[in-house]
Each structure stands twice: as C-alpha cells, then as structure tokens.
Amino acid sequence: MRIVFDIGGSVLVPSKPDVEFIDKLSYELTKVSEDHEIAIVVGGGKTAREYIEVASKFNANETFKDYLGIQITRANAMLLIAALKERAYPQVVTDFWEAWKAIQLKKIPVMGGTHPGHTTDAVSALLAEFLGADLLVVITNVDGVYTDDPRKNPNAKKLEKISARELVQIVGKSTSKAGASTVIDPLAASIILRSGIKTYIIGKKDALRLFDVIRGKHEGTTVEP
C-alpha cells in the first residue's frame, strides 16, 4: 500500500518535544515502511499557535502568521527526520513532486506546511490525492471524531465509522484562521471527500501500533469514501 501519515504537531511536541513518543513512533513508521510506501506530513501544534498568538499582538496579518506557522511545522518535521535516521529523505520536503521523487528513492519524505491558507491536514489530504495513496492516517491528540469537542463537552460521543460527506458536515463550521486547531480542518475533509481516500483518525495510543492501524484495527474513527 501507499500510505500518508498526517501527524499533529501537538502529538510530537505537547509542550516540549516528547522524546520517548517520537522515538517509538519513528520505530513504528520505519517498520511500516519496510512493506509499504509511506509519506509523512507534520503539523505545528501548540508551538505554532503560541508563535502565531504573539505575532497577533504585533498586528501581523493572517498570511504572515500562516508563513510563521509553516516554519514551525518544518522544524517539527526536522525532529522526525532526525528520529527516522537513514530511512528518511534527509531534508524537509516542500512540494509534492519532491515527495514522489523521495519515494522512488525508497526514502520516507517528511513534509511540513507548504502554502498560506493550507493547514497540514489539507497538505496531507492533497499529498494523498497527488500520490494516489490507498490510505490516509491522521494522528491527533483527540482519538477520533466526536459529536462535539470531548475536551469541552464530557457528553460528546466518539463516532467509530462515518462517511467522508458526514465528516465534511461535522467539521464544516471550523475556523480557517492561522493556527486553528480541530480534529481535521474543513478543506482537508473536502479533499478526502472528492478524492475518495479511506481515512483513519486516531490518537497517540493507536499511533504506537501502526501495523494494527493500517489493517483497520484501531480505536479511532474510520472515514469511508
């Protein structure tokens, strides 16, 4: 299979880099890459949001703040490249053609953000579409799609299986401002819908058993085309 992994920045760097988790995740990704072609996109997470918040105090515009966030995503991507060692393409990949070329070289391409207005969720979905991926795996700090934000509403229920169209409806009211944080952003959901990409949305626990996840055995949400 060809698989794209979308890894939230706050998963890797909750307040500071989670060295143990990054090490274990890189091992899982390396093992999966032995039997499958994989590509990775890393988000900016809490660190990017903090930088963007400070930039807002200086009246930076949304495009400037998007560029600032992109730099943080690429710093996080470099951390993962370091952990993946020789299995990774040695520098952060910045466009989809370069990602494709890295795969042909039997290396794992690791990307961050690319363009203002596109979250790394959207980059992941676009990359999966471009590469003709069989599967998109979204790793977040929320272990699936819920009826409401489980961090704010204790009565929110996890949805084990939904359609891509239902995903679009659920996330459709999310903000598109720089640094916005949702389980997946509306643009990414729309790309998943149009591309018919099977998607798993999982949390950190499942991220440490990726062989099970790619076979459909996980505790997150399956998004069917």
From Swiss-Prot:
GO terms for biological process: 'de novo' CTP biosynthetic process; UDP biosynthetic process. CDD domains: AAK_UMPK-PyrH-Pf. Inhibited by UTP. Its EC number is 2.7.4.22. UMP binds at G44, D66, T114, H115, P116, G117, H118, T119, T120. Signal peptide: none annotated. Pathway: Pyrimidine metabolism; CTP biosynthesis via de novo pathway; UDP from UMP (UMPK route): step 1/1. SUPFAM superfamilies: Carbamate kinase-like. It comes from the Archaea. Its main location: cytoplasm. ATP binds at G9, S10, G45, R49, T140, N141, Y146, D149. Belongs to the UMP kinase family. Catalyzes the reversible phosphorylation of UMP to UDP. Homohexamer. This is Uridylate kinase. It comes from Pyrococcus abyssi (strain GE5 / Orsay).
